[in-house]
Amino acid sequence: MKKKVLSIFLVMTLVLTMLTGCGGGKEASPEEAANPNKLTVWAWDKAFNIYAMEEAAKIYQADHPEFELEIAEVGWNDVQTKLGTIVGSGNYDQLPDICLMQDFAYQKYVITYPDLFLDITDSGVDFSQFAAGKVSASVVDGKNYGVPFDNGTAIAAYRTDILEQAGYTIEDLTDIDWNRFIEIGKDVYAKTGYSLMSTQAASSDLIYQMLQSAGVSTWNEDGSVFFTDNEVLKQCVEIYKEMADAKVMQIVNSWDEYIATFTSGKACGTLNGCWIMASIQTATDSAGNWAITNYPSLPGVAGATNYTNQGGSTWAVTSNCKNVDLAIDFLNSTFAGSSELYDTILPGAGALATWLPASESEVYAEPQEFYGGQQVYTLLSDYSSKVPAVNLGVYYTEANAALYTLLANVVAGADIDAELQTAKETVEFKMQ
């Protein structure tokens, strides 16, 4: 009898223990459960994109104090690698809620991997309030796949104190062509030991900037590769080679080295998208000794201008977003709806808005002491309105890679025509 009572007692104890474990105990800790007020983001460039996203979070938190934002710094090359790995494995759980995408590559990702990003056409974002040319970078088959962010209008920025040592002013580098640029660059180098600009080896961005300044594409209207018989492209490569040989332009390997050339090294200028101003402004010891102007034009080319574009990016909501409504409301309330945000990140990072209402702010007309009192944002707004349109193509990334291989070979002494033919064949193979 005692054994029977003991058995019943043990069974009851076991049942009570199981009940406690299954539902009678405490609930999962907040750390164990998904945070409904948190978004994760992938972005690159601490001084620009990440800074802008952090400022957007502060503004959103004013009305949503429970909101949290976790930003992972992921370089653009790493973003591409990660996306490729995720698509290959089918494990979309590794995606963040929001991912920054380069404009020149975004359409290809949407077309090639339709399950990666969300269609936000009917999300409530007013896309008519963005520059039409900017919006088009994230539109596929009439549907919107992102919230536009920065303007990539190109600038030429120079150290005026170094130019002065060689006998030049910013006006001497305004409205000039590449022939005059090289002439001045040789003189500046001879007198000061400073190159007029620098570039990164594994990049053909400079070539694309030159081409767009004249409205010339690397693609024919039927989508085929336009490398050979493209006399303007050949001219751009010749200019690149001449500048490298004459030490008018430094060529370095990494992005960090590129930034260092003009913030602490021996380049007294840089030509890039206006977003580069965020990196220029990290050189606080040279504050007041910088000025910006427009871009050199291609000599002898019909339709050539002193205006071009480089880059620009878009915020995309991924298919793995845990809280789509929160992500949309956050982006709509900040990058698509806050003048305060753009008033902050414009002087803070040189983030020129493509959200049109932001340009009405008085901040745009304020003199910037870092640039010697220039009204730089008024200049940028003017430049952006004069940039020629150009077709970058769905296979921009493949063309870009082929061209920077070409540039390395040409600088080393290879024949330009032969390299253009090889690059054309390389891109055509990758398009198959």
List PLM regions with ranges:
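Short, low-complexity disordered leader/linker segments with a strong preference
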Residues: 1-40, 62, 418-421, 425-432
